[in-house]
């Protein structure tokens, strides 16, 4: 169920997360972001918060690292502009991952990697992901390619988390992908995009509870735009300012004892994404601290 307002006020959430301590440094030039990170209070309930680097797709790898460190996030899912999962070499992908590892940041997965019914294309993706040291990536197989993906999941022992992409996608809702993968290896699971699911009239919190056994990543975002099948320029907003019931989503993750990553994917079309990311992270940390 979607709630335009939340029982936990934004003021309470932001206070709990000490957003002021994180926001002002992030308004400085990116070169200054490598300063010592702040320390945030509150309980996380075991939820691992990270960043989907698609949020910062126009920034360099070095700039992304600086932002992640300042936000005190520990994990990142790397978009293809930062690591060429489908087109590059194993060494190119490994080199990018190493840059994050050297800064104490764990690369847990990828941006969305297309997985057509083409053995050479799918093998290259698995080679690059596995060769770079990852045990999981976010994929978008077709229904026809699921048996092929299962073959490689078993060969490489790598998890594939299927990303839902809204009303016009082959998997409009995460529950659609869940139903499609039930006959296949359990290492084929879900990356639940709560925003795209909402656009397809899905209740993200309910799906988290229903599909708990196959969820391997969550993309956190918010929107106040119309349900027109895509995130319009007016649609994506800072997490907590939109129409999604973020509190219910986080409560569902806490209830299932979610052991994987909830990655912020902030898509508001603004020149500088960093302040909005800071507020989004602070809001969610505040929610968790108050639970």
Describe the role of every protein-language-model region.
Residues 51, 68, 100, 160, ...:
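Conserved, mostly hydrophobic/aromatic
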Residues 1-8:
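N-terminal secretory signal peptides
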Residues 64-79:
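Catalytic domains of carbohydrate-active enzymes, especially glycoside hydrolases
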Residues 75-76, 155-243, 247-250:
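Acidic/histidine-rich catalytic cores of soluble enzymes
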Residues 28-59, 66-67:
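C-terminal segment of N-terminal export signals and the immediately downstream linker at the start
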Residues 78-95:
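Glycine-rich, proline-tolerant flexible connector loops at the mouths of alpha/beta enzymes
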Residues 52-56, 81, 112-115, 142, ...:
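Active-site beta-loop-alpha junctions enriched in small/polar residues
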Residues 18, 23-26, 41, 63-65, ...:
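Active-site acidic/histidine proton-transfer and metal-coordination neighborhood
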